[in-house]
Structure formats: C-alpha cells, structure tokens
C-alpha cells in the first residue's frame, strides 16, 4: 500500500509541474485550433460519405 501512495504522490507532483509550465491559450490560438478541428471533422465526414456512396454504388443497396 505505501508503494501505491508514493506513486499517487509522484503523479500529483509531476502534474503540478506540468500545470506550472503550461499557459492558457490566447483568443487567436483558440480560433486557430477551432478552425483546424472543424476542418478535420469535415474531412473525416466527407471521407465517410464517399465510402458510403461507393459502397452503395458497388453493392447496389
């Protein structure tokens, strides 16, 4: 049991270090990330739709 407690303590210590180094993104960075995410969702949706259309055309159903 002490080993588990030590692992949990180390995890929180490392997590605290990460939070101290990171920073909150600015508005421009947020907009860029949102655009890239939206574009990725759109591309994945289009690929799925194309696969579905090809399947319908090949299998007739």
UniProtKB/Swiss-Prot annotation:
Provide the Gene Ontology terms for cellular component: plasma membrane
Membrane topology per the record? Single-pass membrane protein
Which Gene3D superfamilies does the annotation name? Answer: Preprotein translocase SecE subunit (1.20.5.820)
Q: Give the molecular function GO annotations.
A: protein transmembrane transporter activity
* Record GO biological process: intracellular protein transmembrane transport; protein secretion; protein targeting
Pfam families (alphabetical): SecE (PF00584)
Q: Identify the keywords attached in UniProt to this record, alphabetized.
A: Cell membrane, Membrane, Protein transport, Translocation, Transmembrane, Transmembrane helix, Transport
Its annotated compartments are: Cell membrane
Q: Which domain of life is it from?
A: Archaea
What InterPro entries is this protein classified in? Prot_translocase_SecE_dom_sf (IPR023391), Translocase_Sec61-g (IPR008158), Translocase_SecE/Sec61-g (IPR001901)
Transmembrane spans: 39-59
Primary residence: membrane
Output the SUPFAM superfamilies linked to this UniProt entry. Answer: Preprotein translocase SecE subunit
Q: Which HAMAP family match?
A: SecE (MF_00422)
Q: NCBIfam families this protein is in?
A: PRK09400.1-4 (NF006909), secE_euk_arch (TIGR00327)
Give the protein's biological function.
Essential subunit of the Sec protein translocation channel SecYEG. Clamps together the 2 halves of SecY. May contact the channel plug during translocation.
Please state which protein family the record places this protein in. Answer: Belongs to the SecE/SEC61-gamma family.
Oligomer and partners: Component of the Sec protein translocase complex. Heterotrimer consisting of SecY (alpha), SecG (beta) and SecE (gamma) subunits. The heterotrimers can form oligomers, although 1 heterotrimer is thought to be able to translocate proteins. Interacts with the ribosome. May interact with SecDF, and other proteins may be involved.
Q: What is this protein called?
A: Protein translocase subunit SecE
Which organism does this sequence originate in?
Pyrococcus horikoshii (strain ATCC 700860 / DSM 12428 / JCM 9974 / NBRC 100139 / OT-3)
């Amino acid at each position: 049991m002490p080993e588990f407690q030590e692992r949990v303590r180390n995890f929180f210590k490392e997590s605290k270090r990460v939070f101290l180094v990171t920073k909150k993104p600015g508005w421009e960075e947020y907009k860029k990330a949102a655009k890239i995410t939206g574009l990725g969702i759109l591309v994945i949706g289009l690929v799925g739709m194309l696969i579905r259309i090809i399947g319908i055309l090949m299998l007739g159903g």
